[in-house]
Design a protein with these regions (language model features):
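Amphipathic alpha-helical binding modules
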Residues: 98-145
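Hydrophobic membrane-targeting and insertion signals
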Residues: 1-93, 97, 102, 120, ...
């Protein structure tokens, strides 16, 4: 069984994971529809306008903590010999809440009002948005931790 935490220690792999995380996020944002989709797209447009490359840098900065939070779920998935997509989707709320512990803590320490405002706009639906991303997220985890 592969460990996400161990995989990220490889300096050749880490940038690939970061790039794939950014692609996954872009795809999820592009898929959003309706009023909430407009809000999500607007929030991310604001974030990207504040500092180009911020999303990639943020993923790189958070990746070790994200891996630590997700790795127990991945290990359970592997122990159960479960289909990663099925496992991650069925555990999406627990995984989302584990990941949000990281970002909630970070946003409390942020000095950037625009980022705080954008996060506050998205946070009420964050568990749902992360849950929507679980199939792609499971594919990403499988790609690197298998």
């Amino acid at each position: 069984m592969g460990s996400l935490v161990e995989v990220l220690k490889d300096p050749a792999v880490r940038p690939l994971v970061v790039a794939d995380c950014e692609k996954m996020l872009d795809a999820e944002i592009a898929d959003k529809k309706g009023l909430s989709g407009i809000a999500v797209k607007g929030a991310f447009k604001t974030l990207k306008a504040i500092k180009p490359g911020m999303i990639r840098h943020t993923f790189d900065d958070l990746l070790d903590e994200l891996a630590e939070k997700v790795d127990p779920f991945w290990q359970d998935c592997q122990t159960q010999k479960a289909n990663p997509r099925t496992f991650f989707v069925s555990n999406s709320s627990a995984i989302a809440n584990a990941l949000l512990e990281i970002t909630d803590g970070r946003i409390k320490r942020s000095k950037f009002k625009n980022i705080i405002r954008a996060y506050s706009t998205l946070r009420p639906k964050a568990v749902q948005y992360i849950g929507d991303a679980m199939p792609r997220f499971a594919d990403l985890v499988s790609k690197y931790a298998s």
